[in-house]
Amino acid sequence: MYEHESCGVRISVSPDYLEDESTPEEGRFVWAYTIEIENTGKQPVQLIARKWMITDANGRTEHVQGMGVIGEQPVIEPGGRFRYTSGAPLPTPSGFMSGSYEMRRGDGESFAATIPDFSLDRPSDRLWLH
C-alpha cells in the first residue's frame, strides 16, 4: 500500500494486477487500484477534480484529468473516509501513476491533495531481494 498525507487529507492506494483482464500477447496489461481518502482535518472537504500522470515502462506518459471520481464529487466529513476502485490499462507490463485531487474545504478554500506515486507491476515481474 502507498500512502501520503497533505493539507489534512490522507490518501492510500492499493494497486492490483488483473491477470484475467490482461492479454499480454496483445500488449494489454490491466490494473485496478483502490483509493481511500481520509479527512484528517477539522472541516469537511469535497473532492472536485482529479489529475493523473500514467507512465508506462517505455516512458510514455498520458495525462488524464476530469471532474470528480467514478462520477462523484464526494463530501468527506472530518474523520470520514471515501473509498473507490478504478482501473488503468497499459501497453507494457509495468509502469507507475501519480497525481492529485483538487479539494475544497467547507470554508471554500481550494487546495491540491497529493496522490502518492505508485507502481504498476505484475506479481511475476517483481524483483525480490534476498
UniProtKB/Swiss-Prot annotation:
Domain of life: Bacteria
Pfam families in the cross-refs: DUF525 (PF04379)
Boundaries of every ApaG domain copy: 3-127
Name of the protein in question: Protein ApaG
Organism of this sequence: Maricaulis maris (strain MCS10)
Gene: apaG
